[in-house]
């Protein structure tokens, strides 16, 4: 199978799984369920279910590769990296899900599309890498667009709650930046045995399961009990939860496949465009009202992201022509 055909299959897989995933996520976390008269806001329980499903699917993915490098051996050799990456990932998801209680879903998706911001912060604060003027300009555009959209909503909640939700989104974005940078470094690290995307998928999701189990058992047993009680009272939640977990797990297979076999630029482009479609789909399906100032925010963010993507493509083409 040719490289282009594989890429098309991967892109279609990412779109199909994560578009369905996003449609299941919104009612799962924001609907007030009839029997319990409450939202299913148990973020750590949701992440636990998602990670457990992804670990099982990832193990099947790794077995299908027949690489001869098992998940246990990989985890033993790289347990420190796996623990660190999974911790930032485990903390990011509950923060993002929790923010949905205070900001609307389209604002959430818009913020999660801004991958440039956490990457810039990680490079400046963690790796002490200078940021060029182009990237700084895009960062300003993205920040301004997010602020316009999030603070310009038609139906505003209390000011403190909205600012709190925005703060939780920013924390989640920064943790995403740490996660992505560390994943990329581990995947491309020289090793005696080849590390694949399937190895990362199994190891990271297994660790996330352990992190969340420890949290629920040691610090928040009421969340575990509340989750089970609400699922018993409103069994319809299970349909959305299963769809959310299954689509997320299958989507991770395509994501790690793309990251392993193609450049991070390709994956970023696919991810950003998928999130754009998710936002527009959410507006159409769930009838969100969007003010003109919010549309301006969307245009500013997407304009900055697309401009940065074009600039990266031009730089890549220039480097290739120099090599020839």
From Swiss-Prot:
Pfam family, one: UAA
Keywords assigned: Endoplasmic reticulum, Glycoprotein, Membrane, Sugar transport, Transmembrane, Transmembrane helix, Transport
GO-annotated cellular components: endoplasmic reticulum membrane; Golgi membrane
Subcellular location: Endoplasmic reticulum membrane
TM region positions: 7-27, 42-62, 106-126, 135-155, 161-181, 199-219, 237-257, 265-285, 290-310
Signal peptide: none
GO biological process annotation, one example: UDP-galactose transmembrane transport
Membrane topology classification: Multi-pass membrane protein
Lineage: superkingdom: Eukaryota
Sample GO molecular function, one term: UDP-galactose transmembrane transporter activity
Record carries keyword Endoplasmic reticulum: yes
Glycosites: 97
Family note: Belongs to the nucleotide-sugar transporter family. SLC35B subfamily.
PANTHER family, sorted: SOLUTE CARRIER FAMILY 35 MEMBER B, SOLUTE CARRIER FAMILY 35 MEMBER B1
Role according to the record: May be involved in specific transport of UDP-Gal from the cytosol to the Golgi lumen. Involved in the maintenance of optimal conditions for the folding of secretory pathway proteins in the endoplasmic reticulum.
Protein name, entry field: UDP-galactose transporter homolog 1
Species of origin: Eremothecium gossypii (strain ATCC 10895 / CBS 109.51 / FGSC 9923 / NRRL Y-1056)
């Amino acid at each position: 199978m040719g490289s282009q055909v594989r890429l098309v299959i991967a892109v279609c897989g990412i779109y199909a799984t994560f578009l369905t995933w996003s449609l299941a996520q919104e009612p799962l976390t924001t609907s007030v369920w009839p029997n319990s008269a409450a939202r299913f806001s148990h973020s750590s329980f949701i992440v636990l279910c998602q990670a457990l499903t992804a670990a099982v699917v990832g193990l099947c993915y790794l077995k299908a590769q027949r690489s001869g490098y098992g998940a246990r051996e990989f985890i033993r050799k790289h347990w420190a990296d796996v623990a660190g990456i999974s911790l930032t990932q485990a903390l990011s998801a509950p923060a993002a899900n929790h923010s949905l209680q205070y900001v609307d879903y389209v604002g959430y998706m818009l913020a999660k599309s801004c991958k440039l911001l956490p990457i810039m912060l990680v490079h400046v604060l963690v790796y002490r890498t200078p940021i060029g003027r182009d990237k700084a300009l895009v960062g300003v555009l993205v920040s301004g667009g997010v602020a316009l959209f999030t603070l310009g909503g038609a139906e505003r909640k209390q000011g403190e709650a909205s600012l709190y939700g925005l703060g939780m989104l920013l924390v989640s974005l920064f943790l995403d930046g740490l996660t992505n940078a560390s994943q990329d470094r581990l995947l491309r690290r020289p090793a005696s045995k080849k590390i694949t995307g399937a190895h990362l998928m199994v190891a990271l999701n297994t660790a996330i399961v352990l992190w969340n189990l420890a949290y629920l058992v040691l610090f928040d047993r009421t969340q575990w009990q509340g989750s089970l009680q609400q699922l018993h009272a409103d069994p319809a939640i299970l349909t959305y939860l299963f769809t959310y977990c299954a689509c997320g797990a299958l989507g991770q297979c395509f994501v790690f496949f793309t990251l392993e076999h193609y450049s991070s630029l390709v994956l970023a482009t696919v991810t950003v465009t998928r999130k754009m479609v998710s936002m527009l789909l959410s507006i159409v399906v769930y009838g969100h009202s969007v003010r003109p100032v919010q549309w301006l925010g969307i245009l500013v963010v997407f304009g900055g992201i697309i401009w940065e993507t074009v600039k990266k493509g031009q730089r890549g083409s220039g480097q290739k022509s120099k090599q020839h």
